[in-house]
Amino acid sequence: MKYLASSQSAILWMSVLFLLATMAYWAAVLARSVFAARSATRMTWAAVALGLSGLLVRWHESYLMGADIGHIPVSNLYEVFVLFCMITALCHLYYEQRYRSGRSLSITTAASTATATAEPDVGAGVGAFVLLVITAAVGFILWYTFERGAHEIQPLVPALQSWWMKIHVPANFIGYGTFALAAMVGCAYLLKSHGILADRLPALEVLDDVMYKSISVGFAFFTVATILGALWAAEAWGGYWSWDPKETWALIVWLNYAAWLHVRLVKGWRGEPLAWWAVIGLLVTTFAFIGVNMFLTGLHSYGSL
């Protein structure tokens, strides 16, 4: 009974539901199944709820180990990958609901029911791709759990014993989650623009709009997170910026998406170039988050594998 009520159990069930939701979304796309699409959405919501429950229970468990050990569960790769899965899924669910509602309105006011029926499901078309990146994160969580025992709660290293962590890390991962969502929507855009699954994916205009709005939200939160990180660094190390590898790559990520938004808003770019850019941007962001921890050393080395 103790295991069933543990944070590890909730997070493992979250992982299972995300995997099932991914399969259901793809079934909805390939078979055009409304039932599969609705089931996928419900499983995604359930997975998010279990992930949140797991993190809250883990927070409580850390305090049961000792008041000096207790901390908000955003301090290591295991915890932040769970957070990443939740945030990315929530962002997808928001856009799914928003565009499904808009589609329902257009269907209601449209004269032709036959045309509306043939229209691809927005939620399934986007979810099938977004859930792939969540599945990759789930795979990492499972590997990290069983191979490295990462689910074990550890005391915070001195550098993380700060209230700044409670706001810097979540803001960062809203950025990461929305950047990941934009990249996967970019993949869907590229496939549809080349005639692959063209009749089963949402309109290019919808995909382009989701991609743009996701990067806009992500850029705003990533900017806030970077500023908070600089303030935290000033308190912890005596300087706002030290050109640590993590800081340098965070700046590269920020400049990348600043340029993306600039060419869209000022230069009027649309379509495939920005879709490719969003996909490549995720690779840059992934290296900034994981690659730096694996291959480079610096003040942020406490986040290594």
Region annotations inferred by a language model:
Residues 1-305:
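Polytopic transmembrane helical bundles with strong interfacial aromatic enrichment
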